[in-house]
């Protein structure tokens, strides 16, 4: 546990963020009541009220001010944004504006030490752009807000932990993103995150970019010329790193526990195995039955975790959204915050 609040940003209030936040609060009410867990929700109070009505609950989430010296264990801070009433499931610039302002306030509070970490519910990239905020996603926005040039996305579900060399770029641009400097940064940040999670001597595997790790150069030389020497240097520096491991087998080995995390070269290479295990769909309706997994941003001066799914406008306001990913994100934020505190003591 951490003695400070976790900042929970609502994301787009027209999405399922308000609902999964209320559901998570209900599921964690025992810990909240004892003070073992403290949550500060940042977003739209009206959207919170709407979610409570949809779920038929009157759970108390009092409003507070950022300047209050003390906050109750569970409370909310109104995002510093204005706009028309936001309707569940309706994409709008106002929804994007609320999402951005909530994140901005959460970052500011966490940088100031008022909150221990920031946990983000999903935003909608189109709504964000309509509001004038042109970021590919949360990760890039947080890097901008904290003044960081390089950050790393790590997805986690159970023991399936996968960090990424590149994410929101065209596949044709991925080889250009694989440089010795970038790969070493990803390895180092992944190693540090695993140590914060309580793994004393992390073992990391690096995925190959090309089929069969390039097959001796027949299918490309990036694995031979870039990845292999970078891995060798990391090993020489005392890290436990192996690779390049062919992409068609690395995640089978990760799931079996042969190593603690994998480094993927690009978005879909890393996202597919995590979501294959963490997501389930109802074959009859096509609706999601289970949404588990956490998105962690490494390399920031603050701790940030997130759900690993989108705003789901199609089911927003219906009381059927799954909160498991948010609860996982809260758990990871606590563990990382505790690990950060331990490393400073």
Swiss-Prot record:
CC cofactor: a divalent metal cation
The protein's name in its UniProt record: Putative D-threonate 4-phosphate dehydrogenase
Enzyme nomenclature, EC number: 1.1.1.408
Annotated gene: pdxA2
Residues binding substrate, per UniProt: 138-139, 275, 295, 304
Gene Ontology molecular function: metal ion binding; NAD binding; oxidoreductase activity
Subunit structure: Homodimer.
Binding site for a divalent metal cation: 168, 212, 267
Lineage summary: Bacteria, Pseudomonadati, Pseudomonadota, Alphaproteobacteria, Hyphomicrobiales
């Amino acid at each position: 546990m951490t003695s400070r609040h976790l900042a929970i940003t609502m994301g787009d209030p027209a999405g399922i963020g308000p609902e999964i936040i209320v559901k998570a609060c209900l599921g964690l009410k025992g810990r909240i009541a004892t003070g073992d867990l403290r949550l500060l929700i940042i977003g739209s109070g009206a959207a919170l009220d709407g979610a409570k009505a949809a779920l038929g609950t009157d759970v108390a989430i009092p409003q507070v001010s950022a300047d209050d010296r003390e906050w109750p264990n569970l409370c909310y801070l109104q995002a510093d944004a204005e706009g028309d009433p936001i309707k569940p499931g309706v994409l709008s610039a106002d929804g994007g504006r609320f999402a951005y302002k909530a994140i901005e306030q959460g970052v500011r509070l966490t940088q100031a030490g008022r909150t221990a970490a920031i946990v983000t519910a999903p935003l909608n990239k189109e709504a964000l752009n309509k509001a004038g905020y042109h970021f590919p996603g949360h990760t890039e926005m947080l890097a901008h807000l904290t003044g960081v040039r390089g950050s790393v996305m790590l997805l986690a579900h159970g023991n399936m932990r996968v960090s990424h060399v590149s994410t929101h770029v065209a596949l044709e641009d991925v080889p250009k993103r694989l440089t010795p400097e970038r790969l070493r940064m990803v390895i180092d940040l992944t190693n540090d995150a695993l140590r914060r999670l309580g793994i004393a001597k992390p073992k990391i595997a690096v995925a190959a970019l090309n089929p069969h790790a390039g097959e001796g150069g027949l299918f490309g030389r990036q694995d031979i010329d870039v990845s292999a020497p970078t891995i060798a240097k990391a090993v020489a520096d005392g890290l436990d790193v192996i690779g390049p491991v062919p992409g068609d087998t690395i995640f089978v080995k990760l799931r079996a526990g042969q190593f603690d995390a994998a480094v993927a070269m690009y978005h879909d290479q890393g996202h597919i195995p995590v979501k294959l295990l963490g997501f389930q769909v109802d074959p009859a309706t096509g609706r999601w039955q289970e949404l588990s997994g956490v998105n962690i941003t490494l390399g920031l001066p603050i701790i940030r975790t997130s759900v690993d799914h989108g705003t789901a406008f199609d089911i927003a306001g219906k009381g059927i959204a799954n909160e498991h990913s948010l609860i996982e994100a809260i758990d990871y934020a606590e563990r990382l915050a505790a690990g950060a505190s331990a490393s400073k003591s």
